Amino acid sequence: MIPGELFPAPGDIILNAGCETLTLTVANGGDRPIQVGSHYHFAETNPALQFDRQRARGYRLDIPAGTAVRFEPGQARDVTLVPYGGRRQVVGFNGLVNGQLED
């Protein structure tokens, strides 16, 4: 064995398997690119992003951890979101929740 060596199981890794998903169309109405990270509370993203924020409450992007989606000025695209799991507590970001999400 080599220190740090990984022995992954055979087959593909399915991200967020079995999670409910939500697809929203998001447009960048600003004049600069906006990047959103994998675990950012999507409802609290940059206000220049135009989408149904109420529907996005309690959701994050359905992308691999540590990655991000970039929205160029004037660009609109569909994104897939998954709900926060665990205790469903959202703290920080833009300070709009800072506690337990209502279900």
UniProtKB/Swiss-Prot annotation:
Its EC number is 3.5.1.5. One of its GO terms (molecular function) is urease activity. Disulfide bonds: none annotated. It is found in: Cytoplasm. One of its GO terms (cellular component) is urease complex. It is an enzyme of class 3 (hydrolase). It catalyses: urea + 2 H2O + H(+) = hydrogencarbonate + 2 NH4(+). One of its GO terms (biological process) is urea catabolic process. Its main location: cytoplasm. It holds the Pfam family Urease_beta. The keyword tRNA processing does not apply. SUPFAM superfamilies: Urease, beta-subunit. Pathway: Nitrogen metabolism; urea degradation; CO(2) and NH(3) from urea (urease route): step 1/1. Keywords: Cytoplasm, Hydrolase. It comes from the Bacteria. The keyword Cytoplasm applies. NCBIfam families: PRK13203.1 (NF009682), urease_beta (TIGR00192). PANTHER family: UREASE (PTHR33569:SF1). Belongs to the urease beta subunit family. Heterotrimer of UreA (gamma), UreB (beta) and UreC (alpha) subunits. Three heterotrimers associate to form the active enzyme. This is Urease subunit beta. It comes from Magnetococcus marinus (strain ATCC BAA-1437 / JCM 17883 / MC-1). The gene is ureB.
